[in-house]
């Protein structure tokens, strides 16, 4: 791609593209690379690059993020509007093999995996599927890139699992820091939060850790809504609960990457007087490879305060976190707690044994049962 004049890359990291992301992130050959807060923003940056340089930009994403990119692809980059050539590189979770059989994946990837290629067809985006066993000739890929230039349109490479070789482990200075691990932070929250409060947890490792902690503690899962997909929307789900049940406090366990993806939602959640919004900030996309987020150099609590939260806190220790939680539980306005965290998770971390539908039903029953105050 570099030989074809590609020098700009932007997107949201994906586990299937981990080696690719590592390569462009560590390249010292003059490549411009910016990790985007969401996929639509990446398309916007790619457009700006093309308008300035006339060279083909690359936007990378997991297929679950294609929805975030559809608006700028359809209303800006399409040949019907500005006609911006760009290359999408899309990790295909929930992929369908050549025989039409869908490979096993987590529930949140099933529908998106099934509709990824039809979605690109409907969007009129020419595409090629890549895999590690039957890679198309380079001439075909070159022809696709040339088509992007000639027809002034987006094109796509759809990447199956194991297309790229596994990346070498890279050192992360925050991985061995003195900060708490995320799992310990979640455990500390559970030690303080009353059992009658509902918790909405964000996408990725955090929800898996919450589930395992409930198992270890012999507690049920009915009070927790695990937001397994829809990255960045856990806080908005929590806001919906706050509005529907103003008599009870609602807790959102969020992450920095998720918060950044739809950060405009802070101006809405800040208005919920019964919300306790806890953001665990490790400055990384931990679930898909540990690539840095903008929050690695950006304090989030002041942003929350400027967005209208009634009170904000910052914690690096369990003692500071517990003190913030105790104050938040007594407050009568929206509360935002930023907890600094080291990167990393247990290698043996499991996945929920219950289905999303079972989680939904148990959570709804919990919400509609009079709370036993404790």
Q: Which sequence ranges carry the predicted segments?
A:
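DG-centered beta-turn motif at the end of beta-strands
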Residues: 61-64, 248-265
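Low-complexity intrinsically disordered segments
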Residues: 339-346, 350-352
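A short alpha/beta connector and helix-capping loop motif
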Residues: 74, 84-86, 262-281
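A short, acidic, amphipathic alpha-helical segment used as a generic capping/interface helix at domain edges
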Residues: 142, 146, 317-330
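A contiguous pocket-lining binding segment that forms or flanks enzyme active sites
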Residues: 276-310, 314
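Active-site regions of oxyanion-processing enzymes, predominantly non-cytosolic
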Residues: 153-158, 333-339
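Active-site flanking residues adjacent to catalytic metal/cofactor-binding acidic residues
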Residues: 159, 253-256, 280, 339
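Thiamine diphosphate
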Residues: 1-121, 125, 129-151, 155-239, ...
């Amino acid at each position: 791609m570099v030989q074809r004049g590609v020098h700009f890359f932007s997107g949201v990291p994906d586990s299937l593209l981990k080696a690719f992301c590592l390569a462009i992130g560590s390249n010292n050959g003059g490549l411009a690379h910016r990790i985007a807060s969401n996929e639509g923003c990446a398309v916007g940056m790619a457009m700006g690059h093309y308008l300035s340089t006339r060279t083909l930009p690359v936007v990378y994403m997991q297929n679950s993020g294609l929805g975030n990119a559809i608006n700028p692809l359809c209303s800006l980059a399409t040949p019907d509007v500005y006609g911006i050539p760009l290359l999408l590189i899309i990790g295909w979770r929930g992929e369908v093999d050549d025989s039409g059989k869908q490979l096993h994946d987590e529930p949140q990837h099933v529908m998106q995996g099934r509709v990824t290629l039809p979605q690109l067809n409907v969007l009129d985006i020419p595409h090629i599927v890549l895999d590690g066993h039957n890679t198309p000739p380079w001439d075909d890929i070159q022809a696709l890139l040339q088509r992007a230039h000639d027809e002034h349109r987006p094109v796509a490479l759809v990447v199956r699992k194991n297309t790229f070789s596994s990346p070498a482990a890279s050192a992360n200075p925050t991985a061995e820091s003195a900060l708490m691990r995320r799992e310990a932070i979640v455990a500390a929250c559970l030690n303080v939060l009353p059992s009658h409060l509902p918790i909405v947890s964000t996408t990725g490792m955090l929800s898996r850790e919450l589930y395992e902690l409930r198992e270890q503690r012999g507690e049920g899962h009915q009070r927790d809504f695990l937001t397994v997909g829809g990255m960045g929307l856990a806080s908005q789900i929590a806001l919906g609960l706050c509005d529907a049940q103003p008599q009870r406090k609602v807790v959102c366990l969020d992450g920095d990457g998720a918060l950044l993806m739809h950060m405009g939602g802070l101006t809405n959640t800040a208005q919920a007087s019964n919300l306790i919004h806890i953001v665990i900030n490790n400055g990384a996309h931990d679930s898909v490879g540990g690539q840095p987020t903008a929050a690695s150099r950006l304090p989030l609590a002041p942003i929350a305060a400027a967005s209208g939260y009634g009170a904000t806190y910052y914690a690096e220790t369990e003692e500071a976190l517990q003190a913030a939680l105790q104050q938040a539980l007594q407050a009568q306005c929206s509360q935002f707690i930023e907890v600094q965290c080291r990167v990393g998770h247990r290698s043996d971390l499991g996945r929920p044994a219950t289905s999303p539908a079972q989680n939904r039903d148990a959570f709804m029953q919990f919400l509609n049962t009079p709370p036993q105050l404790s």
